[in-house]
C-alpha cells in the first residue's frame, strides 16, 4: 500500500494525497451481497433537515458485511480484497468450505489465499474470531461485540483496534483508542488483529469537489450568517460577542452529550481524547 502525492498539474490536483493499494480487486463487487442504499440528503420522513452538510454524492450500493462471524468450525479462504465506499476500512470476500461467501472487514496483513476461521477452537492469528474469554490478555482485537451475538460494534474503522487488558470473572476489560477503558462480557466475540488500511488518515481530498462526490456539503460559519439564520450572525466585523452556541442556541463547546447513564457502570475510565 502506497501513499501517493499528485503532481500539481492543476489547482485541484496540487494538494491531493491518495492511498493506492494494488491488491484491491478492480472488478465489480459480489452481487448477491449487495443491497440498495438510498440517500436521505440528511432529511427525515417529514422532509426536514435532521443532519446538516449531507446531500448529493455518487450512487453507492451497500455491501452486506458479516459483523457476527458466527460460522463456527468451518474454515474459509480469502478470495480477494475490495474497496467499500461505505466505510474507511477495506473488506475481504471469503469463501467458506461449504460454498458460502461472505464479506468481512479486512484486518491488517490479510491477503488473498489466507485461511481464517471462527469459533472457540480457532487459532490465535489475525483474522480469526473467538469469544474474548479464549483470547490471551494483551492481544489487540477489532470488530468487538458489546453484547454476545449482536455483532461487532467497536473498532471497525480503518487502522483501529482494541486491547484486552484484563479478565475478571465473566467480564474482560478493554482499552479503546480514545483512552476509555470499559468492561464487556467475556462471551462477546472479537476478531484478532487491527483493522487494515491505516493509511486512510493520511489522504487529502485536495478540492471541494472531492468532498461533494462523497455526499458532503459545505459547512458555513455561523458568524458569516445573518441574525435570522444563526445566534452568531449579524453585527459589524467578525465578533459575535457571546459564548459559542449551536444554530439552536445550545452550548456547543465542551458540553457533555452522553445520555446513556444505564451503561455507566461498565466504564472503568473515561476517554482522554
From Swiss-Prot:
> What function does the entry list?
One of the primary rRNA binding proteins. Required for association of the 30S and 50S subunits to form the 70S ribosome, for tRNA binding and peptide bond formation. It has been suggested to have peptidyltransferase activity; this is somewhat controversial. Makes several contacts with the 16S rRNA in the 70S ribosome.
Question: Keyword Ribosomal protein: yes or no?
Answer: yes
What's the family?
Answer: Belongs to the universal ribosomal protein uL2 family.
What are the BP-aspect GO terms? cytoplasmic translation
Quaternary organization: Part of the 50S ribosomal subunit. Forms a bridge to the 30S subunit in the 70S ribosome.
Region of interest (Disordered), ranges: 28-54, 221-273
In terms of Pfam families, this protein maps to: Ribosomal_L2, Ribosomal_L2_C
Q: Which organism is it from?
A: Pectobacterium carotovorum subsp. carotovorum (strain PC1)
Q: Which GO terms describe its molecular function?
A: rRNA binding; structural constituent of ribosome; transferase activity
Which protein are we looking at? Large ribosomal subunit protein uL2
Q: Would you name any one GO CC term?
A: large ribosomal subunit
Q: Using the record, list the residue span of the signal peptide; answer none if the entry has no such feature.
A: none
Q: Where is the composition biased (Low complexity)?
A: 39-48
Amino acid at each position: 500500500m502506497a501513499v501517493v502525492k499528485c503532481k500539481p498539474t492543476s489547482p485541484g490536483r496540487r494538494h491531493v494525497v491518495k492511498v493506492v493499494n494494488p491488491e484491491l480487486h478492480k472488478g465489480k463487487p459480489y452481487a448477491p451481497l449487495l443491497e440498495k442504499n438510498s440517500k436521505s440528503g440528511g432529511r427525515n420522513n417529514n422532509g426536514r433537515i435532521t443532519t446538516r452538510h449531507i446531500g448529493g454524492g455518487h450512487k453507492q450500493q451497500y455491501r452486506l458485511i458479516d459483523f457476527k462471524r458466527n460460522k463456527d468450525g468451518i474454515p474459509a479462504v480469502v478470495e480477494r480484497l475490495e474497496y467499500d465506499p461505505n466505510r474507511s476500512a477495506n473488506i475481504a470476500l471469503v469463501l467458506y468450505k461449504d460454498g458460502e461467501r461472505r464479506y468481512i472487514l479486512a484486518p491488517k496483513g490479510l491477503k488473498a489465499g489466507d485461511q481464517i476461521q471462527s469459533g472457540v477452537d480457532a487459532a490465535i492469528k489475525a483474522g480469526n474470531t473467538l469469544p474474548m474469554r479464549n483470547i490471551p490478555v494483551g492481544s489487540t482485537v477489532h470488530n468487538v461485540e458489546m453484547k454476545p451475538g449482536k455483532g461487532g460494534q467497536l473498532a471497525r474503522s480503518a487502522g483501529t483496534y482494541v486491547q484486552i487488558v484484563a479478565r475478571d470473572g465473566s467480564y474482560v476489560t478493554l482499552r479503546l483508542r480514545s483512552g476509555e477503558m470499559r468492561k464487556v462480557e467475556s462471551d462477546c466475540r472479537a476478531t484478532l488483529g487491527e483493522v487494515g488500511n491505516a493509511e486512510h488518515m493520511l489522504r487529502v481530498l485536495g478540492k471541494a469537489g472531492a468532498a461533494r462526490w462523497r455526499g458532503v456539503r459545505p459547512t458555513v460559519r455561523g458568524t458569516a450568517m445573518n441574525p435570522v439564520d444563526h445566534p452568531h450572525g449579524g453585527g459589524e466585523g467578525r465578533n459575535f460577542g457571546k459564548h459559542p452556541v449551536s444554530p439552536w442556541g445550545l452550548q456547543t463547546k465542551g458540553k457533555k452529550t452522553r445520555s446513556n447513564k444505564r451503561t455507566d457502570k461498565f466504564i472503568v475510565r473515561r476517554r482522554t481524547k
